[in-house]
Amino acid sequence: MKKYAELITKYINEQKYKILREPSGKLPHKFIVPGACYAQEIWDWDSWLTDVAISNTLKTDEEKNAFSEYQKGCVLNFLDNMYDNGSIPFMTSGESTFCESESGESNGAKPVIVQHALFVCKFLGDFSWLKDQYAKLKKFLNYYETNCKHESGLYFFIDDWAIGVDNDPCTFYRPKRSSGSIYLNCLMYKELLAMSEISENLGYNEDNILYQNMAKSLKSAIQEHCFDERNGFYYSVDLDLLPIDNSHWIHMGCPRHWNTLIRKIDVWSGFLAMWAGIATQSQAERMVKENYLKSNIFYSDYGIRTLSKSEKMYLIKESGNPSCWLGPIWGVSNYLTFKALLKYGYNDLAKEIAEKTVTLFGRDVENCGEFHEYYDPETGEGISNQGFQSWNLLVSNMISYLNGEPFTEE
């Protein structure tokens, strides 16, 4: 374990300055790319979590100062490319944006932009640089409120483009506006809490209360609609229901009284309900005992399967566009599940998945000199995209935890 931790730390320290980029075209501010192999690109949740990871390695004031303009610039570049409707491209390069959300008919950036902004503010101990951008943050959240919110109180993906967990069966190839994704809703809950905290620090007290209340309402909706008492797990829900027609005699005697249907597909993102602090303690206990620890569902020697081994859609293969989220081990799902376990006091299990991740990545660095994008849950072999960095760098935060050291938190 110590050998692997040292190999990983050496590798990250050698690579971290290679992810800094100078202003270019549509990216007018200095910025961080999600890995050294990226030329001039920012991606929504990749950039956020890469920043969290790299920040953990900055141990001196000199290093922090050197990175600070790149951290702020990453957020500012997203906001500078906001469309008139308030959506933000999920990816922007120096030359173009890769997104069709301007039309309102396709997904834009996921709700992580505000969280990224809050992270940078807290890491640098400075909110002042964000004051002039505050209206844009509000506009971004209002876009989701206006275009992506269902009558149930849950939010939905417009389509299956760039959802982050590319081919999650709950959204992939599903009809437009039908997926009340647990992944999306947990991110949105944290996004609203982040906006509340930013509002408070900038002196917008009414907004602070507004966003707190919006977060509370969303939490209640997630608990009501997404937790399944039978299986003890949080799921995405199907919103693709026909409207109630009380004029039709064959339905009018007892029309539907529900506005969502749980899609009981075991996807790792159910654990984001723990990461976000949405699950109750008793729900978390069931999630861990009845789901996480089951080797025929999520549990493996190398971390958490991204899709249950028992699902018909389970598949381990190399693919791109979409990348495969149908079971392989990903660094980001291991990390966020690690944080979820810590939040609810499952410290031994958190330690275990951290050790599994360090061993998995350490062996990869030892054998290949770098990381892969995702891994086989049965063998630990890298499957795709050798040289991938991005959120895999969060293993640094896990190493700090295992060493009993403080670590940066998203």
Language-model regions, residue ranges each:
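Solenoid-repeat scaffolds in large eukaryotic assemblies
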Residues: Q71, L130, N208, A215, ...
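Non-catalytic C-terminal accessory modules of carbohydrate-active enzymes
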Residues: K289-F298, L307-K309, P322-S323, L336-E410
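Long, repeat-rich segments with strong aromatic
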Residues: A194, N201, S217-A221, I278-T280, ...
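Aromatic-rich carbohydrate-recognition surfaces in CAZymes
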Residues: Q40-Y155, I182-N185, Y189, V267, ...
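Catalytic cores of carbohydrate-active enzymes
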Residues: K3-L7, E22-G25, I88-P89, C148-F156, ...
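Acidic/His metal-coordination segments adjacent to aromatic residues that form catalytic metal sites
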Residues: H29-I32, G86-G104, W161-S181, S247-P255, ...
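Active-site acid/base region of carbohydrate-active enzymes
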Residues: K2-K18, E62, A66, G73-F78, ...
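Acidic/polar, glycine-enriched structural segments that form the non-catalytic walls/loops
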Residues: M1-Q40, F127-W129, K138-Y143, S199-E200, ...
